[in-house]
């Protein structure tokens, strides 16, 4: 039974899908005017884990994440580079796929783009105008915020409180300062589309409402994104969608915490703006992913090199222990009376599932993985290895790897580490001392299969790589 924290109700709730066995999930994607920064990477990784865990539990997940490919930032960038908006968007959509692919984020079921849904957006806005929820003024179209009775329910703000501080900017023709833009009148030299309201382009909020409706229907199971999107973006999505569809927009809302850089907010003005495109040249992408999930998704996370190094060390411990298990698989035998280890492995797996069922607590899930690695090391050092136990270890390691999306081997780690070879040599020496020559030969042959040659010298056994 999976429970998740629902921002809408401010409490953990048991997940109940609209359709049994299926999850319809929409995650707000990036505005593709630049390479993504690590703040964009966090939701991509966190909600990839959510998706993976639902799939592990047998659900069919329809995972939709959009690209905003027309926006003020894109228009400004196209003017700076003297390129078209579509050219800019194509470049950074390709870069996004490359960056999140390096972070082992699975491809979405669908990545809708705003430009591909322009007719749908225009029709959606027209429907809202026809229903009295929106109005055209001076070539712009605005949403009548006060007409939607539930406005503020996601961010838990009253509309009267929101009124304080709201203002109408010069050039706007709103009925109310709280009304927000659905359609922007075209400006000279900007990309635009023809519509019943005149030449222009959509506002940011309407885009996600329309793409979610087109891809997943009037009501979805889970809508997710960063905490910064809760208000006004997601609040406005609810207003537009529920006014248009006459149905709840999303049953569950998930929001991940912010990323700070050395305990400071990430910003270009502070010079601490970190692009994934750059950082994965210096930090192993697997380590970066492991670091991101080492903290619960709703909590803020602090990025610094010391913490990243700690994540690297932790992942290395897990991988080293798995490597020992793989090595022992080659010399394991059918030994009975090791049920205690099977039971301990099952207990760790049960704990992993328990913490993941509790709002996808990856921090505690990683603790369970560390405990599995500790048990594996103890087992290998203290026991003659059983095929049954080794296979059980491998199966649970693979589950943890698949759910958390962290590979069990680094991309360039096909070779045994020197320290692991030394441990095997010590074990072989002990086997020879005990006249267990069969085991000694098995270890020698296993090392040979890894192109590691043992040499007897007056100083003891040494090895070299073939």
UniProtKB/Swiss-Prot annotation:
Q: Which reaction does it catalyse?
A: tRNA(Cys) + L-cysteine + ATP = L-cysteinyl-tRNA(Cys) + AMP + diphosphate
Residues binding ATP: 268
Q: Where is this motif: 'HIGH' region?
A: 30-40
List the source organism: Staphylococcus aureus (strain bovine RF122 / ET3-1)
| Required cofactor(s) | Zn(2+)
Write out the residue ranges of the motif 'KMSKS' region: 265-269
Q: Which residues bind Zn(2+)?
A: 28, 208, 233, 237
Classification via Pfam families:
CysS_C, DALR_2, tRNA-synt_1e
What this protein is called in its record is: Cysteine--tRNA ligase
Gene3D superfamilies in alphabetical order? Cysteine-tRNA ligase, C-terminal anti-codon recognition domain, HUPs
Q: Name one GO molecular function term.
A: ATP binding
Q: Where is this protein found?
A: Cytoplasm
- Gene it is expressed from: cysS
Explain how, and how many, cofactor molecules are bound: Binds 1 zinc ion per subunit.
**EC code(s) of this entry:** 6.1.1.16
């Amino acid at each position: 039974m999976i429970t998740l924290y629902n921002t809408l109700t401010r409490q953990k709730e048991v997940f109940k899908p609209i359709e049994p066995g299926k999850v319809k999930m929409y995650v707000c994607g990036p505005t593709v005017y630049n390479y993504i920064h690590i703040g964009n990477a966090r939701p991509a990784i966190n909600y990839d884990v959510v998706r993976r865990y639902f799939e592990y539990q047998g659900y069919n997940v329809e995972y939709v994440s959009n690209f905003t490919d027309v926006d003020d930032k894109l228009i400004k960038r196209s003017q700076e580079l003297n390129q078209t908006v579509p050219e800019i968007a194509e470049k950074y959509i390709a870069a996004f796929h490359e960056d999140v692919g390096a972070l082992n984020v699975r491809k979405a079921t669908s990545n809708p783009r705003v430009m591909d849904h322009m007719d749908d957006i225009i029709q959606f806005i027209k429907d809202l105008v026809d229903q009295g929820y929106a109005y055209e003024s001076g070539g712009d179209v605005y949403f009548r915020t006060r007409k939607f009775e539930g406005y503020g329910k996601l961010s838990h703000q009253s509309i009267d409180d929101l009124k304080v501080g709201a203002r109408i900017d010069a050039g706007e023709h709103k009925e109310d300062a709280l009304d927000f833009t659905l359609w922007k009148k075209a400006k000279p030299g900007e990309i635009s589309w023809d519509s019943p309201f005149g030449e222009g382009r959509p506002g940011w909020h309407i885009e996600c409402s329309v793409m979610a409706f087109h891809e997943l229907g009037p009501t979805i199971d889970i809508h997710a994104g960063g905490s910064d999107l809760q208000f006004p973006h997601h609040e406005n999505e609810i207003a537009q969608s529920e006014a248009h569809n006459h149905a709840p927009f999303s049953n569950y809302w998930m929001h991940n915490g912010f990323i700070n850089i050395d305990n400071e907010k990430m910003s270009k003005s502070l010079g601490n703006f970190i692009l994934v495109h750059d950082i994965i040249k210096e930090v192993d992408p697997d380590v970066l992913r492991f670091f991101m999930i080492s903290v619960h998704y709703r909590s803020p996370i602090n990025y610094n090199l010391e913490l990243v190094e700690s994540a690297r060390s932790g992942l290395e411990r897990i991988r080293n222990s798995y490597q020992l298990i793989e090595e022992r698989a080659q010399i394991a035998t059918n030994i009975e009376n090791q049920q205690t280890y099977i039971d301990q492995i099952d207990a760790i797996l049960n704990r992993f599932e328990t913490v993941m069922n509790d709002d996808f607590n990856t921090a505690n899930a990683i603790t369970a993985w560390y405990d599995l690695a500790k048990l594996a090391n103890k087992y290998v050092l203290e026991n003659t290895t059983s095929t049954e136990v080794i296979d059980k270890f491998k199966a649970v390691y693979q589950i943890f790897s698949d759910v958390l999306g962290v590979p069990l081997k680094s991309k360039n780690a096909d070779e045994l580490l020197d320290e692991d070879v030394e441990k095997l040599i010590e074990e072989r020496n002990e086997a020879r001392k005990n006249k267990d020559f069969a085991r000694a030969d098995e270890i020698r042959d296993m090392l040979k299969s890894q192109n590691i040659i043992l040499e007897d010298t007056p100083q003891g056994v040494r090895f070299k790589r073939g």
